[in-house]
Amino acid sequence: DTMDYKNHNTTYDVDFGDVQGQELGKRAMLISAAGHHHCIMIGPPGGGKTMMAERLPTILPPMTWNEMVEVSRIQDVIGLLGDKGLVKTRPFRHPHHTATLASMVGGGIQGRPGEVTLAHGGVLFMDEAPEFQRQVIDALRQPLESRTITINRSQGNYIYPANFICILAAN
C-alpha cells in the first residue's frame, strides 16, 4: 500500500561507490543519471563499462509510487513478478547482442512486451552494441524518441511504456 511505499528502503545488490578510478566514465554516468541522458561508452575490454552500467540504477532517483506500480504491472504481465509484490528497485536489463527484434521491442501473437518495456523506469544496457542486428538498433528509434513502443498485431495495437536510459558499450 502507499504507506509502505513512503517507508520503503530501496536496496540494490551493487553500489556505484564500488567503481574505482574511471573518473571520466563515472562523470558520464552521473550526468546520464542527472539528466536522464542516453550514453555510449567506448573502451577496452575489462575497462569497467559493464560495472558502471550495472550500477547506474543505484544513483537514479528513488522510484515514485506510480513508477513502482507500473514496473510491477509490466513484470506481472510476463510472469516475472511472482510473489515479490511491489517492485521497488529500478530495472536493469542487459540483453545479449544476439537478441532478436521481437525480444527487444516485443511481439508475438499477444503483443508481449520486450526488453525496451522491461527496462521501463530503469536502464537498458547494450554491451557489444555494434554486434546487435541493424534492425534491432533501428527499432530503438521509436522508444528513444517517444518513450513508448507500439506493437501492431491483427488483433489490435499494443502500446507499452518504454521510458528508460539506454547505455551502449563497445570496444
Where are these regions (language model features)?
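Walker A/P-loop
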Residues: 34, 39-84, 141, 146
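AAA+/SF3 P-loop NTPase mechanochemical coupling elements
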Residues: 92-93, 114-121, 152-171
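Short glycine-rich substrate-engagement loop in P-loop NTPases that contacts/grips substrate
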Residues: 93-118
